[in-house]
Amino acid sequence: MDRGDCRSVLGLVCRVRLEDFANGVVLPHEETLSKAKEDRFQLLSATRCNFSSIYSLYRDEGGLTRQRLLNLKNTCPPRYAFSDGLVTHRLWVVNDPVAIQALREDFAGRKLYIADGHHRYETGLRYRDALREQGAYLPGSEYILMTLTD
């Protein structure tokens, strides 16, 4: 691979509270197809598991969140690192309550723009609403797996 083609993406993989689009917190940009959502709903209902994160963008004016993530990344080696020869992934685990709270505060009031995963996000909303209608509560059903990047 030509080193000139290298790219680096810094993201935060986390759970995000499901928000109805009308609330203006999580914003879509494309239409979705019913058949694809039905497939995903059946899978989520059967497994109660997010297999793939929603990829979302946020604005980090001033770069505070990015700097926080870089600082966390530089405090220890990655927990997981793997490569297929072309793409390398490195994952760090953040379990420091102070760091987690700082990141939560960074994202409070910030809009998230779905770049990839509209069908999965809408499926998460439907699943959450179905459980609410049944009076059922499952830990995590109010959240969805998301990767956030600026």
Give names to the regions the model predicted:
Residues 1-150:
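Surface-exposed, charge/polar-rich loops and edge strands
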